[in-house]
Amino acid sequence: MARVKRGVQARRRHKKILKQAKGYYGARSRVFRVAVQAVTKAGQYAYRDRKVRKRQFRRLWIVRINAAARLNGLSYSRLINGLKKASIDIDRKVLADIAVRDQATFSALAEKAKASLTA
């Protein structure tokens, strides 16, 4: 059987890593050993931050809903509780979008929440 040298595979692997490290500062974009570490760490950060992004958006939606709710004389928790009691099933993403883009509709929802809290 013929001897196989791994030069082609090594070159391909090096090119792949250095391509991923393009735009990094200094040795991180030029030296293979350093680039491997940088690309690996970048992947770890990317994986972690895809999870964090979901949490951050939920926090942003809650802040926006709370601000709009307080303009209508309710706190965030009382608004959400009132909507649940009124059987209005609307998620925080959509509710925050309504609060920002359509205050009249949000006010109507807040009134329904208030009514269901008193009833």
Swiss-Prot record:
Pfam family of the protein (one): Ribosomal_L20
GO biological process terms held by the UniProt record: ribosomal large subunit assembly; translation
Q: What start and end residues bound the annotated signal peptide?
A: none
Q: Which PROSITE patterns match?
A: RIBOSOMAL_L20 (PS00937)
Q: InterPro entries recorded for this chain?
A: Ribosomal_bL20, RIBOSOMAL_L20_CS, Ribosomal_protein_bL20_C
- MF terms per GO, please? rRNA binding; structural constituent of ribosome
State which residue ranges cross the membrane: none
The alphabetical list of record keywords is: Ribonucleoprotein, Ribosomal protein, RNA-binding, rRNA-binding
Please provide one cellular component term from the Gene Ontology annotations of this protein. Answer: ribosome
* Keyword Ribosomal protein attached: yes
HAMAP family registered for this protein in UniProt: Ribosomal_bL20
Question: What family does the database annotate?
Answer: Belongs to the bacterial ribosomal protein bL20 family.
* Cited PANTHER family: 39S RIBOSOMAL PROTEIN L20
Role of this protein: Binds directly to 23S ribosomal RNA and is necessary for the in vitro assembly process of the 50S ribosomal subunit. It is not involved in the protein synthesizing functions of that subunit.
Q: What is this protein called?
A: Large ribosomal subunit protein bL20
Q: Which organism is it from?
A: Alcanivorax borkumensis (strain ATCC 700651 / DSM 11573 / NCIMB 13689 / SK2)
